[in-house]
C-alpha cells in the first residue's frame, strides 16, 4: 500500500508551492472485503470524496451524486462564511429529506435528489439556489 499512498500524497508535496491535482476512482459496495480495506486506506489521502449513486443513475436522475455521502475537506476554507453556512444548511436539509420518518421526510435518495433538482432548476445561479433554501 505504501507506494500508491505515497503517489497520491504527492499532490501535497510540490516543490516551491503550486498544486497538483490527482483524480482517482475506487469501486466500493462490491461485497469484497479487500476493496473496502483499500478504500478505507486511501480515504484519508484525498481532499474530496464524490459518491455516485447507482440507483439514481439507473433511474436516469443526473447528476447521480449522493450529496449526503459526498464532501470536501475544509469546505469552509474554500467558501465564504455566508456560502459555507448555506451549503451546510443544504446538506442538513438533504439529510432530513432522506432520514426515515418520523424524524425526516422518508424520501428515497432518488426522490430527494429530484426535489433538489426541481428547486435548483427554478433558480438562475448556485447562490440564488442556496438563498432560496433560507427563505
What residues fall within each predicted segment?
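P-loop NTPase catalytic core
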Residues: 1-135
Amino acid at each position: 500500500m505504501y507506494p500508491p499512498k505515497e503517489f497520491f500524497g504527492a499532490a501535497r508535496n510540490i516543490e516551491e508551492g503550486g498544486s497538483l491535482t490527482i483524480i482517482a476512482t475506487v469501486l466500493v459496495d462490491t461485497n469484497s472485503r479487500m476493496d473496502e480495506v483499500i478504500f478505507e486506506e486511501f480515504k484519508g489521502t484525498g481532499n474530496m470524496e464524490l459518491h455516485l449513486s447507482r440507483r439514481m443513475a439507473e433511474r436516469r436522475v443526473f447528476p447521480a451524486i449522493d450529496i449526503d455521502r459526498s464532501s470536501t475537506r475544509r469546505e469552509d476554507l474554500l467558501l465564504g462564511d455566508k456560502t459555507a453556512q448555506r451549503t451546510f444548511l443544504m446538506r442538513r436539509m438533504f439529510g432530513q429529506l432522506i432520514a426515515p420518518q418520523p424524524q425526516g421526510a422518508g424520501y428515497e435518495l432518488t426522490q430527494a435528489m429530484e426535489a433538489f433538482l426541481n428547486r435548483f432548476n427554478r433558480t438562475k445561479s448556485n447562490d440564488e439556489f442556496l438563498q432560496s433554501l433560507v427563505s
